[in-house]
């Protein structure tokens, strides 16, 4: 489908997109056409700023919709970075900048490689993937820069091909940091790396010191082949299902695979691993679920409660739901019964339009409550 992107100069750009495209994808297409880096783009639709990881479908953006492009002006605010020598560096940043971005700016000014920088604010070491906003760092805040001394120690990483890579690290480096260094040297994305030491797979958030990895230790690097692992899912009846998955699969994906094999709708599935219920948007890697791990499948019993959904034609649909069901789940059940795609559904209760990520409990919707279904007409406003 085509959508339009209108800039503040009044120029309109036409893009070829799909409902399943993420906002990141759209920004990349704008970069291809206009040369504007994604991190300088803010996209607005229906008065809302669009988040990178969400899809066009999530925002009900349909063919010939118009998005508005606002540029993030560089230099939203100034912050200061104080070094141990007492020197103060001034940086132009935005609240949405990540700590990585800030370290890159320091490198531009001072020539200090990011992997030698540790930034401290309010007594806390700042993590690369987080933003200034996450740490409540505001204009004219002062960060403290501590240097990681080079040559803390060397370690070796041996690949399955027999190649050995030498890395400069410190005991306080996390496994994430080590994977990033391997990426810098070898170009292998961190999410395709598995590091093994003393027969144990190393977890991203832990440090080398946590695993007692010392100078000249050798780690083993195993690549995660795309599609390369099997996991098991055990049901309460004792049946075990085998699934082909990737570490990057989300829990939603896994539930869809179980539905394909067993016919159990995802909204009736609860997956448990290491005693924890798994959340739909997270990945297997997030939970450190590895090959041949076993998940436990618990069914949400139907009949938690009944609610009614009344359409504009006067028809009333009865649904079996639970208080913990999200509005997305309810729309999926309506789709199952009536064939109406969720992105064409608007649900109203007590005069309020219900938001997808919220639960029935959030809106105090109880058994035998009646919701009202209004259709969004395709191609309408």
Swiss-Prot record:
The keyword Methyltransferase does not apply. Keywords: Cytoplasm, Isopeptide bond, Nucleus, Repeat, Ubl conjugation, Ubl conjugation pathway. Belongs to the ubiquitin family. This is Polyubiquitin 3. GO terms for biological process: modification-dependent protein catabolic process; protein ubiquitination. Ubiquitin exists either covalently attached to another protein, or free (unanchored). When covalently bound, it is conjugated to target proteins via an isopeptide bond either as a monomer (monoubiquitin), a polymer linked via different Lys residues of the ubiquitin (polyubiquitin chains) or a linear polymer linked via the initiator Met of the ubiquitin (linear polyubiquitin chains). PROSITE patterns: UBIQUITIN_1, UBIQUITIN_2. The keyword Cell membrane does not apply. Residues 1-76, 77-152, 153-228, 229-304, 305-380 form the Ubiquitin-like domain. Gene3D superfamilies: Phosphatidylinositol 3-kinase Catalytic Subunit, Chain A, domain 1 (3.10.20.90). GO terms for molecular function: mRNA binding; protein tag activity; ubiquitin protein ligase binding. GO terms for cellular component: cytoplasm; nucleus. InterPro entries: Ubiquitin-like_dom, Ubiquitin-like_domsf, Ubiquitin_CS, Ubiquitin_dom, Ubiquitin_ubiquitin-like. It comes from the Eukaryota. Residues 381 form a propeptide. Ubiquitin is generally synthesized as a polyubiquitin precursor with tandem head to tail repeats. Often, there is one to three additional amino acids after the last repeat, removed in the mature protein. Alternatively, ubiquitin extension protein is synthesized as a single copy of ubiquitin fused to a ribosomal protein (either eL40 or eS31) or to an ubiquitin-related protein (either RUB1 or RUB2). Following translation, extension protein is cleaved from ubiquitin. There is a cross-link at residues 48, 63 (Glycyl lysine isopeptide (Lys-Gly) (interchain with G-Cter in ubiquitin)). There is a cross-link at residue 76 (Glycyl lysine isopeptide (Gly-Lys) (interchain with K-? in acceptor proteins)).
């Amino acid at each position: 489908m085509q959508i339009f992107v209108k800039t503040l100069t009044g120029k309109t750009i036409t893009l070829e997109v799909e409902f399943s495209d993420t906002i990141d994808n759209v920004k990349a297409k704008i970069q291809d056409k206009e040369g504007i880096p994604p991190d300088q783009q803010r996209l607005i639709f229906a008065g809302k700023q669009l988040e990178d990881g969400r899809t066009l479908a999530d925002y009900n953006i349909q063919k010939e919709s118009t998005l508005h492009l606002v540029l993030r002006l560089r230099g939203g605010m100034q912050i200061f970075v104080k070094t141990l020598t007492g020197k103060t560096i001034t940086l132009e940043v935005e609240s949405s900048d990540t700590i990585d971005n800030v370290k890159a700016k320091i490198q531009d000014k001072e020539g200090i490689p990011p992997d030698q920088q540790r930034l401290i604010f309010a007594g806390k070491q700042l993590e690369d993937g987080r933003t200034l906003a996450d740490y409540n760092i505001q204009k004219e805040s002062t960060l403290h820069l501590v240097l990681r001394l080079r040559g803390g120690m060397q370690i070796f990483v041996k690949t399955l091909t027999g190649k050995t890579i030498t890395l400069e690290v410190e005991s306080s480096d996390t496994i994430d940091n080590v994977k990033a260094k391997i990426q810098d040297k070898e170009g292998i994305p961190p999410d395709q790396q598995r590091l093994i030491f003393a027969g144990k797979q190393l977890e991203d958030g832990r440090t080398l010191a946590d695993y007692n990895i010392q100078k000249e230790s050798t780690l083993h690097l195993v690549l995660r082949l795309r599609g390369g692992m099997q996991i098991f899912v055990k049901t309460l009846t004792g049946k075990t299902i085998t699934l082909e998955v990737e570490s990057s699969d989300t829990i939603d994906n896994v539930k869809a695979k179980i539905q394909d094999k067993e016919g159990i709708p995802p909204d009736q599935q609860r997956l448990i691993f290491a005693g924890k219920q798994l959340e739909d948007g997270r990945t297997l890697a997030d939970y450190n679920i590895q090959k041949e791990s076993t998940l436990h499948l618990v069914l949400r019993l139907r009949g938690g409660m009944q609610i009614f959904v009344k359409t504009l034609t006067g028809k009333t649909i009865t649904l079996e739901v639970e208080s913990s069901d999200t509005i997305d789940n309810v729309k999926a059940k309506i789709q199952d019964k009536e064939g109406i795609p969720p992105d064409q559904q608007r649900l109203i209760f007590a005069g309020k339009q219900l938001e997808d990520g919220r639960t029935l409990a959030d809106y105090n919707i109880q058994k035998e409550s009646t919701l009202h279904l209004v259709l969004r007409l395709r191609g309408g406003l």
